[in-house]
């Protein structure tokens, strides 16, 4: 959002000239401005501060184009926008002269022992919605910069919400280097941090580009559950669990569901195995990102499967990142997790989803989960649903689930004979 913040009250006509003359249009000393920025940003709680010019992010644009052409953006239309737009800060603000990149840790600690019957949540989503939290801090920071530097500042402030290659800008600003998992890695903080930006119409002394290397380490590539990391720094979103459970609005491909495991929202595997995170991950000092401020590290699957209305969903998850996939998307995810965990206590809730939920997406994935869990109650519900289901996609899932449940029952019978 483009905004102007005036720390002064509206002046009377007689004082306009005095206040206007007190505010310059230009920063006098870019180096001093950089020092002031560092001081103010760190006081706001940002652990990483960097600056780069507002020119095109050429290298990042080239990589993005190759990724787009390979079809790896999946259904994320916003990532298929023209590279010329995504790689140029001045397309967002014509008067731009500097891009300030800031990093704030969201690392809440290690995942606790698996909650029985729980679906895992990626760490960035344990607390409050970072868009809402960081946006307000950026507003305050811009206003404080204007007051401290004594000049009017035209700025655009955002975090993960505008068409710009934010990680490329942050790398140019010295915040880190690109790891093989495509995450931006800071050698002193790891990769568990949010990136926030201020595009300013003022010249601020820039920082050197971020440097670093993964060396010979390929742990993220070899441990990705779905093999989504196709080459160093290249992630195929069509296979990525984070995409499949968050941005994806359709079904999770049947052939990938078992690889999703117990992840109900996002995935941290490629970050969990990273040596930089094992040694350097910095615990967040922002209380808004703590587990107690939001959904936490696990979702009780049977409870989530019982959410039937958007109003109930919003009441429970409003103000957190978990609203992103919507009610149907989150129940889809929890159904898959229930199936992978063979969660027998979830059978009644899954049967209810299959019989009563208004979303074909939920009914179809609930059917798959029942097929994975098996048992007489699951099989009976699937057979009854096969006679009533009107949606073709859901009916296909039910038929597949019946076959799976039947095979599972045959296996049990053979083992017992």
Describe every region a protein language model picked out.
Residues 16-213, 261:
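Auxiliary alpha/beta "docking" domains used to position bulky ligands
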Residues 195-237:
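Loop-centered beta-sheet repeat module
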Residues 331-343, 363-375, 395-409:
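Structural detector for internal amphipathic alpha-helices that build alpha-solenoid repeat scaffolds
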Residues 1-19, 413-416:
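N-terminal amphipathic/basic-hydrophobic helices that include classical n-h-c signal peptides
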Residues 293-332, 336:
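Glycine-rich phosphate/pyrophosphate-binding loop
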Residues 324, 328, 344, 358-361, ...:
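Alpha-helix N-cap/helix-start positions at coil->helix boundaries
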Residues 312-316, 342-355, 375-387, 411-417:
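Amphipathic alpha-helical scaffolding segments comprising HEAT/armadillo-like alpha-solenoid repeats
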